[in-house]
Regions:
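Solvent-exposed soluble domains appended to multi-pass membrane proteins
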Residues: 1-318
Length: 318
């Protein structure tokens, strides 16, 4: 991530193992916000559509209990993946969808990441002074499809040895996201209020988009080894703060652990579940639909039982 190459101070970077590729953003959201894992749920399931039907403990509800204002943002239809119904059940006070993004700019018909940054800053500046905020933003700019129908993208990115319009468009959009992240960090570097920014991908694009990369290696998406296939479920993540935090590079994690890692890095008191997750990470460093190596172990079974309780049986009592 170019915008962070000069910002090693107070930064943690690494790769996040997620349970989806090419789509189903909601499942990565679910893992990050709840600390639960898709590895324990049926293949093809979407918790936002099938399992979250009542108040469900999450990072948002926990931070709300600590006095935080909690905001969710997604610059598209509010009903997508049932977000308008799910976010309140996860403890968000407010949800801003596309109709709340006034005066936004667009890329390929989607509200762009720069406008998302503007909305984050606007929300931060309007919140109650002295009250901390948790702002969860799911961007839309880089959503598929990627075609050669849009010729107005600035700073076209190509890969030597390939002639793929899809790949070029995708990488150009990622470059624009990098610029938006830099804009966000530049703003909060100037703020006195302690702030942590966590930036991560929801999933990689479809096989068709990255096929030219494999072709350069003499391979195809259809003949990848198990290890190579797992690479298709990795996305970058960054934790940055405008105050002193421990620094780390090239870390490996999975989406269910990232929320607890963020809280620990920020110096925010952890919930009992988050403390549990960080202990579990020592025994199971990675867990996702693609990382089930610990299946059947005591650590796996204990985690699975606790997740079932929190997702299906929890009644709001501590």
């Amino acid at each position: 991530i170019h915008s962070l190459q000069q910002r090693a101070e107070n930064t943690q970077t690494g790769y996040l193992n997620v349970s989806v590729k090419g789509g189903n953003t909601a499942n990565t959201e679910f893992e990050f916000l709840t600390g639960d894992t898709m590895a324990f749920l049926p293949a093809g399931s979407i918790p936002y559509q099938q399992y979250i039907t009542k108040d469900t403990p999450s990072m948002a509800s926990y931070l709300k209990s600590l006095g935080y204002e909690t905001y969710a943002m997604h610059p598209y239809y509010a009903s997508g993946w049932n977000r308008d119904k799910i976010y309140p059940l996860l403890g968000f006070d407010s949800f801003y969808s596309s109709t709340d993004f006034y005066g936004s700019t667009y890329e390929r018909g989607y509200i762009d990441d720069s406008s998302c940054v503007d909305k984050i800053i606007e929300t931060y500046e309007k919140k109650d002074a002295g009250t901390p905020a948790f702002i969860f933003n799911v961007t839309m700019q880089n959503h598929s499809p990627y075609t050669d129908g849009y010729q107005n993208l600035q700073g076209n990115v190509t890969v030597d040895g390939t002639v793929s319009a899809q790949l070029s468009e995708y990488l150009t959009l990622v470059k624009l996201s990098d610029a938006a992240l830099e804009k966000l960090i530049d703003y909060f570097e100037t703020q006195d209020e302690p702030t942590v920014i966590v930036f991560f991908g929801d999933h990689q694009p479809t096989d068709a988009v990255v096929e030219p990369i494999w072709n350069l290696e003499g391979k195809s998406s259809s003949d990848l080894t198990e290890e190579e296939n797992q690479l298709r479920y990795k996305v970058p993540y960054v934790i940055w703060a405008n105050y002193d935090i421990d620094e780390a590079v090239n870390q490996e994690s999975s989406a269910n652990y990232l929320g607890a890692q963020m809280m620990e890095a920020a110096g925010i008191p952890l919930s009992d579940y988050q403390n549990y997750l960080l202990e579990q990470k020592k025994e199971m460093p990675l867990i996702s639909t693609q990382h089930t190596e610990a299946e059947g172990s005591d650590a796996w079974l204990n985690y699975q039982t606790l997740q079932y309780y929190l997702l299906f049986d929890w009644d709001g009592e501590k």
